[in-house]
Each structure stands twice: as C-alpha cells, then as structure tokens.
C-alpha cells in the first residue's frame, strides 16, 4: 500500500509518501517546509503558524508527489496528524486532507502525532520494532513508554513540568542563544574545556534519588523546572561577577549533562524493569548527539541497542505520519466523517501504569 502523509501540528508544513507494510516500509519522498519566521519571536506564534501552513500545504504535497514520481491516483490512502498540537495549525492539515481524500475517493486515516514519532525510526532502522522502551522528547512532550507491540503503549513516566525541548529553549534564552535552543546549546556545551566530572557548573540531577524503587510515583517521571531555575541563578551570578562570557559554555554543558543523566537513568530503569533490550528515541531532542552517545553507552553495558532517527525524521515530518498511517490502515481504521483537530489527546492504545499517574 502507498500512503500520502500530511503533518501540520506545529511549525513545520510537511508531506511525504511511504509505501509497504508495517514490517517493511519504503520512504519514497519527504518534504518539510520549516517556518523560520518564528525565530524572530523566540517561539512559535500560533496564528502565524496557521497562516504559513495555508501558504505551504499545496506546494508541499505537490513536491512530495513529484519527488516520489507518483500521482494522487497512485495513492491508496491519505494519513494526517489530527492530534495533539496547535488547533489552528492542525485544522489546516486535517481540512486539506479531508478534502483531498473526498475528492479522490481515498480512505482518510487520522494519526496521533506522538505515535508518528514512534514509527519515524522504523523507516530507517527496520530492527526498531517492538518490544522496546521508547523515549519521546520534544519541545512539547517528554514521555517514557513501554511498547510491547505496535498499538500497545504503556505510559511509565513523563515530565511533571517543562518538556525537555522547552527547557532547552528557555535555557538557551537565558544564555543569549537563538531559538530553537537545542542545537545551539549542544554546540556551546561541546566547547566546554573542563572534564565532565570537574567543570564548575554541575547541577543537581532532578528526581534521581538512589533510594528510589519502581513502586515510587516518581521512579520514571522527570522534572526540569528546578534545573532551569538553577541555571538562572548561575547566569545571574556570572553576570554579577562579569564572567558570563567565560561561563556560558560551562553552564550549557552542566545543564545538558544534567538533562542527559536524568533521561538515561530513567530509560535504563524502564528497560531493566520491563526486560527490554531495545530503546527507541523520538522527537526533536533525540537529535542531540551527546544524548544518543550516553544512551548507547548505557544500553551497551546491558547488551542492548539504541535506535534514533536521523535529524530529518526526528523533528516533525509527514513521513512518520504516513508510516503510522500504514499501520492504522492495515488495521482497518479510518476517519469518521466528523473527524476534527484536537489539541490534546492520549495516544490510541495507551494505558497509564499506576506509577505514571
């Protein structure tokens, strides 16, 4: 089967064509139109995002079809992100997809954005299939999942305040770095000269008590607001002493190390407790090379494997939506006539374990 995917949940207008089955998929095309205008405002402006999607969606779909060298008559179904995300942005994608499916008499498949991130890695790594432990880390979400099978998702833990990507963006602003902050912080942290165990800005690792057990409510959860505040105080101290220019790299390194140590420990706990040898990373923060390296090192010690998508498929894209759409299409799941965009919605098939409540 061949599916056209459409993604407009935030500030990327994307269209892609993916063919095959959940067991063997081929990425035929993927077009992503990023809205760089939001850099001027230091964050995504919802109304501007919606207007940019209106401008970009037709060219994106046309380019995806051309790149795949197919026409709409060659498409078996249209998959579109319907939740979660910015409602106005989502409405652009869902309205266009519904019109397209109706006009060409194609099935319409609604896809949950976060389930799409789980499928992104599968497009490049066929072995990234269940069962596995999944860490979804982006500007809006931080979720730790146990995935025994596609369509079965057990929520183990999540952030109790800021998402990881949000924390990166806010810390980047404190350090005078551009938006989005993930890549600039990673680059700045790499220039810190002192060894990891000696650099002067070592921040506490949130929610990592040595006495913690799987029965504790925070065993898998994360919290980054306190870490963000610690960075704020470090920046103010450096400003007061006139040393901020020299301290920026050290602060960035200390912040990034604290985030990575926290995420790695939570993932290792989940993999150990649920006896998973595979870890799948997803979301924009999964692009962080230091995070990937630390995660691989930790899992290799347990004879495990870590799978992460390339930067193009880690950030929001329609290829992952088409891939998840193939899975849902194979199960016979189609959109109801009254399908609409939803700002917040659990992943279909997800259950919340008691420790994640």
UniProtKB/Swiss-Prot annotation:
Its EC number is 2.3.1.234. SUPFAM superfamilies: Actin-like ATPase domain (SSF53067). It catalyses: L-threonylcarbamoyladenylate + adenosine(37) in tRNA = N(6)-L-threonylcarbamoyladenosine(37) in tRNA + AMP + H(+). Fe cation binds at residues 113, 117, 316. GO terms for biological process: tRNA threonylcarbamoyladenosine modification. One of its GO terms (molecular function) is iron ion binding. InterPro entries: ATPase_NBD, Gcp-like_dom, KAE1/TsaD, Peptidase_M22_CS, TsaD. GO terms for cellular component: cytoplasm. It comes from the Bacteria. Keywords: Acyltransferase, Cytoplasm, Iron, Metal-binding, Transferase, tRNA processing. Substrate binds at residues 136-140, 169, 182, 288. The keyword Cell membrane does not apply. CDD domains: ASKHA_NBD_TsaD_bac. It is found in: Cytoplasm. Its cofactor is Fe(2+). The keyword Metal-binding applies. Binds 1 Fe(2+) ion per subunit. Belongs to the KAE1 / TsaD family. NCBIfam families: gcp_kae1, T6A_TsaD_YgjD. PANTHER family: TRNA N6-ADENOSINE THREONYLCARBAMOYLTRANSFERASE (PTHR11735), TRNA N6-ADENOSINE THREONYLCARBAMOYLTRANSFERASE, MITOCHONDRIAL (PTHR11735:SF6). This is tRNA N6-adenosine threonylcarbamoyltransferase. It comes from Gemmatimonas aurantiaca (strain DSM 14586 / JCM 11422 / NBRC 100505 / T-27). The gene is tsaD.
């Amino acid at each position: 089967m061949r599916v056209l995917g459409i993604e407009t949940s935030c500030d990327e207008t994307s269209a892609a064509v993916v063919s095959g089955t959940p067991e063997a998929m081929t990425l035929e095309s993927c077009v992503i139109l990023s809205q760089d205008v939001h850099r001027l405002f230091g964050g995504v402006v919802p109304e501007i995002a919606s207007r940019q999607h209106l401008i970009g969606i037709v060219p994106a779909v046309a380019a995806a079809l051309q790149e795949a060298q197919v026409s709409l008559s060659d498409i078996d179904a249209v998959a579109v992100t319907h939740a979660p995300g910015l409602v106005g942005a989502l409405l652009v994608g869902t309205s266009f997809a519904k019109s397209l499916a109706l006009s060409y008499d194609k099935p319409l498949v609604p896809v949950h954005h976060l389930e799409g991130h789980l499928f992104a890695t599968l497009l490049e790594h066929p072995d990234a299939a269940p069962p596995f432990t999944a860490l979804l880390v982006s500007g809006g979400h931080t979720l730790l999942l146990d995935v025994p099978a596609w369509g079965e998702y057990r929520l183990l833990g999540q952030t109790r305040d800021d998402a990881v990507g949000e924390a990166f963006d806010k810390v980047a602003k404190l350090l005078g770095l551009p938006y989005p902050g993930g890549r600039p912080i990673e680059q700045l942290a790499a220039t810190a000269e002192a060894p990891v165990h000696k650099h002067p800005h070592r921040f506490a690792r949130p929610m990592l008590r040595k006495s913690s057990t799987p029965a504790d409510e925070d065993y898998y959860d994360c919290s980054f607001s306190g870490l963000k505040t610690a960075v704020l105080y470090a920046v103010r101290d450096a400003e007061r002493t006139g040393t901020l220019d020299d301290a920026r790299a050290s602060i960035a390194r200390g912040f990034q190390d604290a985030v990575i140590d926290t995420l790695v420990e939570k993932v290792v706990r989940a993999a150990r407790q649920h006896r998973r040898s595979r870890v799948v990373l997803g979301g924009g923060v999964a692009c962080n090379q230091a995070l990937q390296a630390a995660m691989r090192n930790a899992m290799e010690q347990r004879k495990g494997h870590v799978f992460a998508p390339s930067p193009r498929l880690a950030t929001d894209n329609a290829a992952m939506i088409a891939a998840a759409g193939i899975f849902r299409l194979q199960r016979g799941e189609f959109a109801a006539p009254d399908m609409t965009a939803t700002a917040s919605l659990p992943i279909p098939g997800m259950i919340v374990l008691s420790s994640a409540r």
